[in-house]
Amino acid sequence: MKQEVILVLDCGATNVRAIAVNRQGKIVARASTPNASDIAMENNTWHQWSLDAILQRFADCCRQINSELTECHIRGIAVTTFGVDGALVDKQGNLLYPIISWKCPRTAAVMDNIERLISAQRLQAISGVGAFSFNTLYKLVWLKENHPQLLERAHAWLFISSLINHRLTGEFTTDITMAGTSQMLDIQQRDFSPQILQATGIPRRLFPRLVEAGEQIGTLQNSAAAMLGLPVGIPVISAGHDTQFALFGAGAEQNEPVLSSGTWEILMVRSAQVDTSLLSQYAGSTCELDSQAGLYNPGMQWLASGVLEWVRKLFWTAETPWQMLIEEARLIAPGADGVKMQCDLLSCQNAGWQGVTLNTTRGHFYRAALEGLTAQLQRNLQMLEKIGHFKASELLLVGGGSRNTLWNQIKANMLDIPVKVLDDAETTVAGAALFGWYGVGEFNSPEEARAQIHYQYRYFYPQTEPEFIEEV
């Protein structure tokens, strides 16, 4: 009997992947190929995506795992992508203008001048989404101001996940989790905001029916099936924005904050309430819609391992193994003998170290950076608790930064709550697959699907006495 799987097509900024996941959340087959944006013809500093190239990359991935897939019964397909990007299309779904990439600087001026249409504070209070130059709203305002005839001609605006879903099924839809990144939703109503659309002159008719995660969009059509080398008629289930599925796929429960630790740290939570009026008071804050109706994902982000990489280059070399830095910092007592670091290297004039003496070593500088970043996390978690009306009892940690066991322990000590680390990197794919299984009727809810997965976490508990932490 063939093994049943959900096939997740994941379009990331650096890689496009096809991954087959079984009912227990185990990966049965996977393939990956690099993804890259193109330089726009109009201006060599502008970036855009080629939809045809992305679809070809998916086809290449599916063909790489074709022999494994022929041994499987593919119950459903789910598509995940990065947020915000999309394109205007005609009635056949043909692009009227290329997909402007989130990396493209052309929309920065629109963001800077948005106050002439609607106040930035009001915008965030309604939509939840922070002021980021790549937001969908700014792309549409840019198109309206520079190519007004395209907005008039357009049948629809499709987010990138919906562009892919349209090519698979022929259906025009809007993934709710993608719309949640757009800065055009009334986040409390889970629908496009008449106030924002009216102020910016964007017609509501451009946005096709909203689909919730786990809802069936349609089935795989002949041309797409031939391109991917898959059987015709496979149900295509709505997923959408990768962040929301990473939260669910990591096992995050309601009111359990999740920290994705990498070059940037992104702190988010799945909360039943959110005070969007507070968001604009905190730089780097945002709020998106959760994968499940009735929940929100408020969050904030800041530069983290990017600071540590700079410290490494400054005192060691860019190639020095991290373990060497960690071992030197372990020898320093908590508090780094009074050396403190203000870690906001991007926007604070007072960034850097204080309390340096003739006895200060490079280990002190690195430990102070770890402690300074953790103090930043502590402040941001307190803000998030206020915004999301919850109290954290533990922190779920994912991403490359979670491999630093000393930093994990410092986090547990300073936050005074357990830190649990999930090593599995495929949280987005896992989350999308769980909604896929729910969508094809295998389970009564995404939670029931998730209950089949055995999560393995490593725990770091607060330590009252300073001690050297053994490698876990």
Curated annotation (Swiss-Prot):
Question: Has UniProt tagged this entry with the keyword Transferase?
Answer: yes
Q: Which UniProt keywords apply?
A: ATP-binding, Carbohydrate metabolism, Fucose metabolism, Kinase, Nucleotide-binding, Transferase
Q: Does the keyword Zinc apply?
A: no
Q: How does activity depend on pH?
A: Optimum pH is 7.8.
The broad enzyme category this protein falls into is transferase
Function, please? Catalyzes the phosphorylation of L-fuculose. Can also phosphorylate, with lower efficiency, D-ribulose, D-xylulose and D-fructose.
Q: PANTHER family of this UniProt entry?
A: SUGAR KINASE, XYLULOSE KINASE
The protein in question is named L-fuculokinase
In its UniProt entry, the species of origin is given as Escherichia coli (strain K12)
